[in-house]
Each structure stands twice: as C-alpha cells, then as structure tokens.
Swiss-Prot record:
SUPFAM superfamilies: Ribosomal protein L4. This is Large ribosomal subunit protein uL4. It comes from Thermosipho melanesiensis (strain DSM 12029 / CIP 104789 / BI429). Belongs to the universal ribosomal protein uL4 family. Transmembrane segments: none annotated. GO terms for molecular function: rRNA binding; structural constituent of ribosome.
C-alpha cells in the first residue's frame, strides 16, 4: 500500500492515508493516456462547422463573359472558389466526431494518470472540505493553507450533495481551479463533471478528499 500525508483545511498534517497500489502506484502508460485524451477531446467537438460549395452559394447562373476575344482569362462562373464571394473548395461540413475506447483501457488510463500525479508528488489528500454556503474567499483560504495558491489545481469531491456543491460553486471564480465530482468517473462514459484523464493531467496539483479516495478505489480497484 502506498502512503501519503493527510491534511486538514488548515494545512495541518493530521496523519497518513494508505492508497491501493493497483490504483495509485502502477507504472503510468503514456500511450493509453494519450488515447483516452484523444477520445475525450474528439467526442467533445460539436461538429457544426459548415461552408457552402460553389453549388450552394447564390448567383453565378451565367457565364461572366464570352470565352474568347476579351483578353482576359476564361471564366465559367462568378461563384467558383477562386472568385470573391465564391464557394469554398473542400471546406468543412457538419459531421459527427466520435471515438471509442474499451472500459479496460479507460480504467488503465485513469489509474495511470493518478499514479503519475502521486509519483510526481503532486497529489494532495485532505480529510474533508465542506462549506455551509458558497464563498470564493473560503476556498482561496483552504488552497493558501495547503500551499496551492496561484497554481492550477484540480479538486475532486466524492459525491453530489449541497455542502460539496457549495465547494464546487466557490471554485468557479478562481483562475486555474476546477472542481469535479468522483461520482461519475470517466469509465463507463466521459462525463463533463466526472473525474477524467484530461483534467488530471491539465492541472499541476490534484486534491482528493478521503471520501474521494474511497470512491475511486471502489470503482477502479
């Protein structure tokens, strides 16, 4: 079992926490993490970009000028791609961007990302963070106590409930800070609010609550 220090919201070391090695201490697989992120970013694309071809823009029904004897280059339509206001050649059209990754690879990618953060000493475990009401100042104070001020920090909460929801709202207005819920880790599907590889690797520090660690080990262990 891997061990890490346990802190409270005042930044005080109050003990240690044992982490499952099969979840937090495996050899990170760079290839699988890349595949997961590629899938996640691809599936987040709207696919709504659209342009008109020469057959879809208005006008251009007749030949601009006769073929010969003008001294100018021959032209067939004022809506050809090389004309101003003409159609677009090989432009984007609405399409579905979708990639799959099997559940085994998703699990491995998440465990690799978590293990990488622990290996780099960028994983912080806090006993609990709960606010009676949303307040940005309170969360800033917690981050300051933990020595995480002015850093890109990902905070993962164990579940959706009002006191944790207040923490999530409190983090909205702090640059570089993102708060997710571990209730829906991106194993069965990539959830915007759930724990995922991209957000883990896109932030310098990963903050987990004790309840979050239990939830992650329950799903990935």
């Amino acid at each position: 079992m891997a061990k890490v220090d346990l802190f409270n919201i005042k930044g005080e070391n109050i003990g240690t926490v044992e982490l499952k090695e099969e979840v937090f201490a495996i050899e990170p697989n760079q290839d699988v993490m890349w595949r997961y992120i590629d899938m996640q970013l691809t599936n987040s694309r709207a696919g709504t970009a659209s342009t008109k071809t020469r057959g879809e823009v208005s006008g251009g029904g007749r030949k601009p000028w006769i073929q010969k004897h003008t001294g100018r280059a021959r032209q067939g339509s004022i809506r050809a791609p090389h004309w101003r206001h003409g159609g677009v050649a090989h432009g984007p059209k609405p399409r579905v961007y979708f990639k799959r990754l099997n559940k085994k690879m998703k699990r491995l990618a998440l465990k690799s990302a978590l293990s990488l953060r622990l290996k780099e000493n960028n994983l912080v475990v806090v006993d609990d963070i709960k606010f009676e009401k949303p307040r940005t100042k309170d969360l800033r104070e917690v981050l300051k106590n933990l020595g995480l001020e002015n850093q890109k920090v990902l905070i993962v909460l164990p579940k959706k409930e009002s006191e944790y929801e207040n923490v999530k709202i409190s983090g909205r207005n702090i640059p570089g800070v993102k708060v997710l819920i571990a209730d829906n880790p991106g194993v069965d599907r990539v959830n915007i609010d759930g724990l995922n590889v991209y957000d883990i690797l896109n932030h310098d520090k990963l903050v987990l609550l004790q309840g979050t660690v239990q939830k992650i080990e329950e799903v990935l262990g």
